[in-house]
């Protein structure tokens, strides 16, 4: 597993207490980076997640070899190149480990419909079973609890809420930011 973390953003104090109060077993905040916008023609190239439980936090972060060339325009967004994924495992192998990491904990993602579209499509293609856990979307949540925000993009919310977002558009950094946005939203709810 490769990790890209500049600094720890582990939940503490009231944020962690609220997450654990509402989700005693814990939650998994996740993010994907992809070669494009459609799961039917594009591929996952990075999967990351942060698991939050009463015992603490753990991380999953891995590049995925998509088996296709990564388009230049998406390299310009996330910075992930063909060379970076050349020795990485394929999506089926990574997905199996990712699902084991998540277990049956509730999942949280920013713009969850996008990430879930890829996860469900790839799981179906590889005959993997999607966990029967609820999924929460911080983008939808922010529209309810952070109505004053100029928009509900991950980077905007992070900036407005004082959440460091180093390496934006890398999956682990975005999963960490999603986790903090989720916790802050739960405190406001």
Describe the function of each predicted region.
Residues 2-132, 147-169:
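Conserved non-catalytic scaffold segment of RNase H-like nuclease domains
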Residues 129-142:
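Conserved beta-strand -> loop -> alpha-helix junction used to position metal-binding or nucleic-acid-contacting
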Residues 185-189:
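Mixed-charge, glycine-rich, non-catalytic linkers/tails in nucleic-acid processing enzymes
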Residues 140-143, 159, 180-183:
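Generic alpha-helical structural context detector
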Residues 170-183:
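Acidic, divalent-metal-coordinating active-site segment for phosphoryl/phosphodiester hydrolysis
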Residues 34-36, 140, 177:
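Short, glycine/acidic-enriched loop or turn micro-motifs at the edges of active sites
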């Amino acid at each position: 597993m490769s990790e890209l973390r500049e600094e720890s953003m582990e939940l503490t104090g009231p944020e962690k207490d609220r997450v654990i109060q509402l989700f005693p077993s814990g939650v998994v905040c996740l993010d994907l980076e992809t070669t494009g916008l459609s799961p039917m023609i594009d591929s996952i190239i990075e999967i990351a997640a942060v698991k939050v439980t009463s015992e603490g936090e753990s991380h999953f972060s891995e590049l995925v070899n998509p088996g296709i060339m990564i388009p230049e325009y998406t390299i310009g967004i996330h910075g992930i190149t063909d060379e970076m994924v050349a020795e990485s495992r394929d999506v089926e192998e990574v997905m199996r480990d990712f699902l084991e990491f998540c277990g049956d904990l509730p999942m949280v993602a920013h713009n969850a419909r996008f990430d879930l579209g890829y996860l469900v499509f790839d799981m179906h293609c590889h005959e993997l079973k999607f966990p029967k856990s609820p999924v929460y979307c911080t983008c939808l949540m922010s529209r309810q609890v952070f109505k004053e925000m100029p928009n509900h993009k991950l980077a905007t919310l992070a900036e407005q809420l004082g959440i460091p977002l180093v390496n934006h558009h890398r999956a682990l950094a975005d999963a960490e930011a999603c986790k903090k946005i989720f916790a802050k939203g739960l405190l406001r709810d």
